[in-house]
Amino acid sequence: MKINIIAKRIERLDKLISSNTDFSRSEVVEIIEKNCCVVDGKIQNKKSTIINPDSKIEILSVNSTEKKTYKKINTYLVDEDIIVVEKPANMITHRASKNNDVSLCEHIVNSYPEIKSVGDIDRPGIVHRLDKDTSGLMIIARSANAYEKLKEMIKERSISRNYEALVYGKPKLKEAMIDAPIIRDPKNPIKRRVSIGGKESKTSYRIKKNFEEYSLLDVKLFSGRTHQIRVHLEHVGHPVVGDNLYGNKKSKLTRSFLHSSKLEFFHPMKNKKLSFESPLPLELKKFIETIS
C-alpha cells in the first residue's frame, strides 16, 4: 500500500512527511533513506530536499527486517466468543501500512490463531480501538457471530465505556456533558477538531479529584469518534496531560494520561451482563503521587 500526499507549500521533505503522517522522526528518515519516497515520479533519498507546492509525494511500504517479538497480553476474560484484554500504552491497536510496530491485534492472533479469520482481514477480531498512547480495556471478538453482534452493539452504543483522564487545570463544573460535533482537521489529516457540520459526538466527565494544576476525571463515551475524548477535553480548555497532539505543554510522561478503566456490556452470545475494571498503570499511579 502507498500513502499519497499533495504539498501545500514550500517545505523540506522530512518536515512535510512528519506534518502529514504520524510517523516518528526516525521512521521518516528511514523511509527517505531506503528510497521509499517518490516525489513527482522520482525517488528522493535526501531529507533536506525542498518540495514545491502541488508536488505529489508517494510513500511506499518500508519492510522491517527485524524479527517480531510477541508479548502475552493481560486478559480479563477468555471464552469461545470474546476476549477482554488490557492494551498497554505505546502499542497500536492494529497495523497500518505506515507503521511497523507490532500491534495488539498481532499479539492476540499469535496467542489465539483462530481469530485470524474473524472480521476484517487487516484487523481480525477488532471491534473498537484505543489510540496508541492510551491503555486499558478492550473487547476482542473470537468468533464470527460475536464479531457481528459486537459491531452492532458498538453502533447502537450499548457498550458502556469509562476512562480515567488527568487534565490540565480545573473544570468549572464538577460534572458536564460535552456535546460537540467532530470533523477531520483540514489542515492536519492526523488531527480532529470540533466544528459545525461534523459527526455527532458526546462525552461526559465527572471530576474525581482536583490537584493544584491538574484534575483527575472519570470520562464516559456516548459515541466513538477518533480521538474523541482528547478533542473534547482540549475543546473545553483542559487537554489531557501527556497528549503531544492536542496539548501544548511538555510532560514527564512517556504517554498520554488516558486509561480505559471500565467496560460494561451484555455478552454478545449469552446475554449475560459483564463488568470489568482496570486499575491505573504504574506509570500513571506514580505521576499522581508526584502531584499529590
Model-derived regions: residue spans:
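RNA pseudouridine synthases
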Residues: 1-292
